[in-house]
């Protein structure tokens, strides 16, 4: 089961305490930008570099309460998500977007009821080449994010587990 953060109350600190041996804890590299700072769901992945075509393609699908994890290689030269993609994600039922890279339109994104975590905000848009991979394991912040695993995020950080800890 996945869902919007307002449907189930959780704290990553409590989940870490209760499931210490079965969760991975991300290094604190990302900050909150979205209107929801607590979100969770089964995760899907995209691996790209300074190109957000595959990010858009993923967010155009039915999110079904999932979280999109974007491995952008940590680039700070351009944004992989802006307000239109964040709005699209919200409308299509995604609960959150986690970006190892940058976003833009941060003020607008902060008003949307979706979780968004990223390294930084930068005004420059990305290229549109369509290069990259979808639904593959990606690694950043000291963790491997595998499609189908569960991601839990709140102001304390991000944790990942192989199963739904809230079921």
Where do the model's predicted regions map?
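Short, charged beta-turn/beta-strand-edge "cap" motif at the junction between a beta-strand
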Residues: 144, 157-159
């Amino acid at each position: 089961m996945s869902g919007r953060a307002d449907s189930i109350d959780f704290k990553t600190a409590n989940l870490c305490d209760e499931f210490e041996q079965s969760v991975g804890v991300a290094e604190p590299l990302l900050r909150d930008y979205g209107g929801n700072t607590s979100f969770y769901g089964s995760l899907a992945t995209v691996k790209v570099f300074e190109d957000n075509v595959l990010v858009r393609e993923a967010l155009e699908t039915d999110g079904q309460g999932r979280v999109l994890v974007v491995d952008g290689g940590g680039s700070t030269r351009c944004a992989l998500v802006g307000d239109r993609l964040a709005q699209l994600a919200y409308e299509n039922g995604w609960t959150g977007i986690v970006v190892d890279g940058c976003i833009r339109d941060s003020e607008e994104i902060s008003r949307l009821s979706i979780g968004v975590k990223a390294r930084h905000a930068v005004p420059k848009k990305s290229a549109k080449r369509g290069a990259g991979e979808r639904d593959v394991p990606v690694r950043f912040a000291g963790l491997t994010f595998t499609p189908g695993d569960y991601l839990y995020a709140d102001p304390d950080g991000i944790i990942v587990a192989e199963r739904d800890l809230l079921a």
